Amino acid sequence: MQKKAVILYSGGLDSTTCLAIAKEQGFAPYALSFSYGQRHQQELEVAKLNARPMGAVDHLLVEFDLRKMGGSALTSDIEVPKEGVGEEIPVTYVPARNTIFLSFALGWAETLDCFDIFIGVNALDYSGYPDCRPEFISAYETMANLATKAGVEGKRLKIHTPLISLTKAEIIQKGLSLGVDYSKTHSCYDPAEDGAACGRCDSCRLRLKGFAEAGVTDPVKYQKL
């Protein structure tokens, strides 16, 4: 019987590649997306349209509103920076977001009798978010195996991070080798009303840099700069 895996799936470049990798590795992917009050709602529309065509057995959308807390340019009226990736943790960091996301994934995994979770975090070409680092993932996996019925019963849960040591160009090349259609992904933090990417936020800059280094044209629509 095919093993199940919960895939954190935003509709972005990394999570879409992650879903394709899970499928390549023989897992039956269960896609998990979140509507958390993010300003870039277009990613959810992409996720809804593409989860099942990408091979997801099921696609669950969980809704909660982090705008009530604020603290991030993605969940409040703070302006999204357009001046490139700096050294400090940027204002686009959403406090504890991956901890929250992984906790929902952990709960769904237990419900599904599933012991594998995939998350598309990356520690090379990234914005410096603390919850994308290997040490965070390792600590969370340890906690998950202490905090769940499955873990206590000896059914070890594993958090897979297949992109964590890849450059953005390598991620794109891997996805293309698996047939990922990157025109059906969304990365921009501050898109136009028609969905066109801004081309200037951290996420757009990292994406464009990755495509350039991979020698491939990014197929998504960008605003005229």
Curated annotation (Swiss-Prot):
Listed cofactors: Zn(2+)
A single GO molecular function term of this UniProt record: ligase activity, forming carbon-nitrogen bonds
Parts forming coiled coils: none
Key word Oxidoreductase present: no
Keywords: ATP-binding, Ligase, Metal-binding, Nucleotide-binding, Queuosine biosynthesis, Zinc
Pfam families for the chain: QueC (PF06508)
Binding site for ATP: Y9, S10, G11, G12, L13, D14, S15, T16, T17, C18, L19
Superkingdom to which the source organism belongs: Bacteria
GO biological process, one term: queuosine biosynthetic process
Pathway involvement of the protein, from the record: Purine metabolism; 7-cyano-7-deazaguanine biosynthesis
Cofactor annotation remark: Binds 1 zinc ion per subunit.
Record's catalysed reaction(s): 7-carboxy-7-deazaguanine + NH4(+) + ATP = 7-cyano-7-deazaguanine + ADP + phosphate + H2O + H(+)
Keyword Zinc: yes
Record-stated family: Belongs to the QueC family.
Matches recorded under PANTHER family: 7-CYANO-7-DEAZAGUANINE SYNTHASE
Its biological purpose: Catalyzes the ATP-dependent conversion of 7-carboxy-7-deazaguanine (CDG) to 7-cyano-7-deazaguanine (preQ(0)).
Name the UniProt record assigns to this protein: 7-cyano-7-deazaguanine synthase
Underlying gene: queC
